[in-house]
Amino acid sequence: MSGNTRLEGPSPQGTGRVPGLRPPAGQSRGKLVFLGLCLVLIGLNLRTAFSSFSAVLTEIRASGTVPEWAVALLTTAPVTLLGLFAPLAPVLSRRFGSKRVLLGAMVVLTGGLLVRPTEWGSAGHLPGLIVGTALCGAAIALCNVILPSEVKQDFAHRLGLMGGLYTTAICASAALGAGFTYPVFQATGEWSAALLFWAAPAAAVVLLFAPVAVRAPRARAGADHGGTNVWRSRVAWHVTLFMLFQAMTSFSVFAWLAPILRERGIDGASAGAMVSVSILLQMLGSLFAPTLAARMWDQRGINVTVALMTSLGFALSILGPLEFVWVWIGLLGLGQGALTAVALTMIMLRTRNPHTAVHLSGMMQGVGYGVGSLGTLIVAQIHNTTGQFALAGWAFLAIGVGAVTFGYLAGRRRNVDGAG
């Protein structure tokens, strides 16, 4: 493998900025602020499709309109789609321009959220749920990949700040879907109305972002900023495997933390409160971690620290003494939010131009989400085989070793690309 470039000279991240980099030419402060707002609002829509479905899953099952095999499909397919469609983002971005692809993805996401709760005549809700979920997964995959390269392109002078804001928005998106979907169901009495609700904020972002995307310069025909094949870069693989182990843990926490706490004897209300606190702490961790990472000479220390916090917090939530469960939840929440944020920040800190950033983002999220989704299946298989979650705690300690190892390697002060 090749493409490993050691960085020389004074720290480019010493103050959370990259010295010598200024806002893009022709971009006024007001335009940059508005663009930053749009990117954050896009982030706020990237997890509601997942968490809103989980919030009313009991009601969907009780309605009898969706068979159990479809429930399994609808809960696991979205994460798989994130991995399958991520590699398409660099191709589309090169052809149409990244902002136009972002806009198109948000249009598709809005369409998916509109289709998902619709009833298709005698076929019922199942076709709409499947088609809508597929559209949402594909659209979110494209946004996941392009957002970091957009930050790299337009906010290279504020990587830490913008990285923190958009990753916090993604964490907040999961919290919004989990927290507001059930109240909408209670108000309307229809789970389909509760799911349909989330098309409104997505449509609002489309209207807000459309003028920015339409006025953005088109990608130059045949433009290829030359050179770096991220799939042959050792640094790119270190970053990708760091993302993979992060994703295995994060998606497992998202899917299984509440059932794990319930099985340990914690009542439903308390388990829900613990999950909510964990999500709030994730937001806090994701807000500050990118800025801290960008200010460091290299990121080995922060990568290892947050990987240890996450794996220990999750394992102890499964295996540790219950009298300290709030400590384990706090450790997990802060660690997981920071781990997700620094993994995504590696895209910007390990590349020198937006072209390489979008290719690295497609690689690490394609592999990371595609393979990382197996984490939820590992937990399910362990529980189905043993009847309990205890073995999963040991499994995620082993996964934590992988996150620590590749977090250390990804954190070394090297770039994927030598150009730029």
Task: Label the model's feature ranges.
Residues 157-158, 164-214:
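Helix-loop-helix hairpin linking two adjacent transmembrane segments in secondary transporters
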Residues 53-54, 234-286:
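Extracytoplasmic gate region of multi-pass secondary transporters
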Residues 51, 79-87, 174-175, 279-287, ...:
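Residue-level signature of mid-helix packing/kink "hotspots" within the transmembrane helices
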Residues 34-68, 86-89, 144, 253-258, ...:
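Extracytoplasmic
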Residues 354-390, 396:
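A late C-terminal transmembrane helix in Major Facilitator Superfamily
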Residues 299-343:
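C-terminal transmembrane helical hairpin of 12-TM major facilitator-type secondary transporters
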Residues 84-126:
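Conserved MFS/SLC helix-loop-helix module at the cytosolic interface between two early adjacent transmembrane helices
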Residues 132-168:
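Cytoplasmic helix-loop-helix junction between adjacent transmembrane helices
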